[in-house]
């Protein structure tokens, strides 16, 4: 091993707002003591950082002219759970992009408020 992963860092125009969006999904704590670098931390100590990027150009998945830089996958158990989760993330400001279909296993793609794609996956452990 050359190194250990510390945490992902997400570029965005408003770190506090985007960290707040993901905090509501994950139920993690936000540390916005530095407005240009905001932390999201789980009870177990996992972290995601959100860094201000004034010139942030959001991706437009699946448009190759504006490709995604990364995406996060979140897991729920069943299609019923993904239905509930979809309503909740959209109420937080997510934009629905794609449904892979599948009654027992699949994923749905959304944009977060800064334009980064993320997925709600279900049935992955079947």
List the predicted regions and their residue ranges.
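Short, small/polar residue-rich loop motifs at catalytic or cofactor-binding pockets
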Residues: 103-105
């Amino acid at each position: 091993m050359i190194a250990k992963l510390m945490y992902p860092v997400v570029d965005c125009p408003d770190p506090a707002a985007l960290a707040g969006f993901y905090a509501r999904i994950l139920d993690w704590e936000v540390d916005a003591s530095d407005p240009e670098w905001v932390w999201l931390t789980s009870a177990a100590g996992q972290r995601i950082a959100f860094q201000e990027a004034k010139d942030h150009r959001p991706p437009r998945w699946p448009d190759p002219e504006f490709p995604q830089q990364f995406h996060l996958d979140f897991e729920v158990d069943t299609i019923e759970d993904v239905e509930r989760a979809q309503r909740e993330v959209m109420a937080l400001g997510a934009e629905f992009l794609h449904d892979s279909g599948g009654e027992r296993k699949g994923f749905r793609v959304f944009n977060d408020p800064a334009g980064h794609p993320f997925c709600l996956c279900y049935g992955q452990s079947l």
